[in-house]
Design a protein with these regions (language model features):
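Sec-dependent N-terminal signal peptides
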Residues: 6-16
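A generic "folded-domain core" signal
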Residues: 22-144
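N-terminal secretory signal peptides that target proteins for export/translocation
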Residues: 1-3
Length: 144
């Protein structure tokens, strides 16, 4: 199953909080600004950490933005970074994450999700996050 399907499943859990569905999601714990969870689908596991924005602008624009770091052991995928915005991204503008002098561009965009295409960049961004650095995500919605 693709990461998009897993993220969509996760968003359904977060949005509707249906107890029958939520039983498949196991919350592991909360660590500072991060929450860790495991989804078990058949015999496959998806482990991930998610963080909500500490600050959002504009404040009047309500959305369910998240930054994810996913692990899919059955597929030998580790440290996969993606974001969701709660709105469709504008493909005319780049989506970036900045922390100090470090800048990361999300190259793969599909509606309201975006991924880093380069594994080396994912590793660098993970190292930045491990240092406890704040990260600012910049993106534009489809309306501008």
């Amino acid at each position: 199953m693709s990461i998009i399907r897993y993220v969509i499943i996760l968003l359904i859990f977060l949005t509707f909080n249906n107890q029958a569905i939520a039983e498949e999601v196991k919350k592991i714990g909360k660590f500072k600004d991060w929450e860790t969870m495991v989804i078990k689908n058949n015999s496959k596991l998806v482990c991930f950490a998610q963080s909500k924005p500490v600050l959002q602008s504009p404040k009047s624009y309500k959305r369910e933005a998240r930054l994810f770091v996913s692990f899919r052991p059955n597929e030998k995928i580790i440290n996969e970074i993606n974001i969701t915005s709660g709105y469709k991204f504008n493909n005319e503008n780049s989506i970036t994450a900045k922390s100090g002098k470090h800048k990361y561009k999300f190259d793969i965009i599909q509606e309201n999700f975006a991924w880093l295409a380069d594994n080396k960049m994912e590793k660098k961004m993970i190292n930045t996050m491990k240092k406890g650095s704040r990260i600012m995500i910049s993106a534009y919605n489809q309306e501008g």
